[in-house]
Amino acid sequence: MAELSTRYNLPANVTEKSINLDLNSTARWIKEPSVGGWTVKWGNFVFHIPNTGMTLLHHLKSNFVVPEWQQTRNLFSHLFKNPKSTIIEPFLALRILLGVALKDQELQQSLIPGFRSIVHMLSEWLLLEVTSAIHISPNLLGIYLTSDMFKILMAGVKNFFNKMFTLHVVNDHGKPSSIEIKLTGQQIIITRVNMGFLVEVRRIDIEPCCGETILSESVVFGLVAEAVLREHSQMEKGQPLNLTQYMNSKIAI
């Protein structure tokens, strides 16, 4: 009778073992206070988030601003002149960025169905909730989120960060400064500004008669400092740099 045999086995990859990937780390959002901000752990990333720009955003949203800042208030009037807009903290703006980075992979790549469903669940959790964990069946994780898939997922997030750094700071030369994505019920706009990345989430209403999308006045927005993402991205030659290279950018943030 023919029997199964393990006569020939390739030696285990020692390097792979030493990495000791925690696949469940994608389903956990760990936020801890630090000096001047927060530390956030998600996946194999550790983000050091300063409390940068919060005071400035609140000041721009008030009516007591210096004349030089009026241009910024006019450009982003739906944020700074809108009583229905809400400022969120930097770690929540980062969470939205990560959700968009996953959604970008889900929409653009040919992922196997099981893996795609996990990416979808993770992106929806990051974008729509503020909970510290999401329950995904260990069996599902073990089958579809292997160590190789985990690495692909994390590499995709880094690639999205790299894409963000190809943006120019808001300018008067017509060069692209924003990434936009439309999802069910919301539009997310990521704009490169002097201090980093302005993240805004606009609610979208569908008009019953003609099916057109109408942006409602309800919007949340926050600022992620450039340094938060810089340490996790790889700048290529010729990519735009920050404020020191943009003397023409007259925005206040």
Curated annotation (Swiss-Prot):
Name of encoding gene: VP24
Disulphide bridges: none
Biological processes annotated in GO: viral process
Family (UniProt): Belongs to the filoviridae membrane-associated protein VP24 family.
KW rRNA-binding (keyword) present: no
GO MF: structural constituent of virion
Localisation: Virion membrane; Host cell membrane; Host endomembrane system
InterPro entries: Filo_VP24
Role of this protein: May act as a minor matrix protein that plays a role in assembly of viral nucleocapsid and virion budding. Unlike Ebola VP24, mVP24 has no measurable impact of host dendritic cell function.
Main location: virion
Oligomer and partners: Monomer or homotetramer (Potential). Interacts with the nucleoprotein.
Keywords: Host cell membrane, Host membrane, Membrane, Viral matrix protein, Virion
Name of the protein this chain belongs to: Membrane-associated protein VP24
Bilayer topology annotation: Peripheral membrane protein
Organism: Lake Victoria marburgvirus (strain Ozolin-75)
Signal peptide limits: none
Pfam families associated with the record: Filo_VP24
GO CC annotations on file: host cell endomembrane system; host cell plasma membrane; membrane; virion membrane
